[in-house]
Amino acid sequence: MIAANQLLEKQSIISNNLANISTTGFKEKFIFAIQNHNVKNLYNSDKKITKEYYNLSPGILRYTGRNLDLFIKDDGWLTVKDTNGQEAYTKNGHLKINSKRKLTIQDNEVIGNNCNIIIPKNIILKILSNGVITSVKNKHKHIVETKIGSLKLVQLPSQDLIQNENGLFYLKKNNEINKKHTNTIKHSKKIRVQSGMLEESNVNASKNMIEMISNARQFEMQMKMISMCDQNAEYANQLININN
């Protein structure tokens, strides 16, 4: 039954991957069942532990020409505040301006680098490669650029992150990570963004479909085996009752 449950868990993850195949910046998730050997050779020494991993390779880049679309390069992440007010990280650079003139990504407020970003009306917005946001105005035949704020860009390795159901990434609750990172991750000057482009989901549709079909067949076999075991147990009980 453990194997069947693991297959169901795999199917759930694959279904989520396929559901997000068109989600900007989505990162493919997969799961492995790892054999855990007890060196002391005690009872129940061999147990399978499931481990979740993320494919953080970049998706295909799509040119949009939109000033509020960003491609976050390398191991950089955009910082947002989720609906619970918690700091989270994303590769989705499709920014929008809400009714309060704040930048959002999928209704999550974008966090500024030591600043509160409010976008003025009737301006041309420009985001530089270092995350600085400027307004561009034409005054008396002269182009005037004014700094509005700066995006908080962070540099985090994939092993320090875990993805939530909302699609956002968070720091793992791990002692080693807490030693390496403080409660608030600092802005990194190394990270660069490119305006006018978006990173597509990196989900491999054909691979996930093949795995889904394979898992479905394995699950069917597991159910047949469980059914056969139940039948054998029932026959054995009947024989015992007859002999008694």
UniProtKB/Swiss-Prot annotation:
One Pfam family from the record: Flg_bb_rod
Location (main, coarse): other
Keyword Transmembrane helix annotated: no
SUPFAM superfamilies tied to this protein: Flagellar hook protein flgE
Gene Ontology biological process terms, A to Z: bacterial-type flagellum-dependent swarming motility
Record keywords: Bacterial flagellum
InterPro entries: Flag_bb_rod_N, Flagellar_basal_body_rod_CS, Flagellar_FlgE/F/G, Flg_bb/hook_C_dom, FlgE/F/G-like, LlgE_F_G-like_D1
GO cellular component: bacterial-type flagellum basal body
Entry annotated with the keyword Transferase: no
TM stretches of this protein: none
Places the protein is found: Bacterial flagellum basal body
UniProt similarity note: Belongs to the flagella basal body rod proteins family.
NCBIfam families, alphabetized: FlgEFG_subfam, PRK12641.1
Subunit description: The basal body constitutes a major portion of the flagellar organelle and consists of five rings (E,L,P,S, and M) mounted on a central rod. The rod consists of about 26 subunits of FlgG in the distal portion, and FlgB, FlgC and FlgF are thought to build up the proximal portion of the rod with about 6 subunits each.
Full protein name: Flagellar basal-body rod protein FlgF
Lineage of producing organism: Bacteria, Pseudomonadati, Pseudomonadota, Gammaproteobacteria, Enterobacterales
Gene that encodes it: flgF
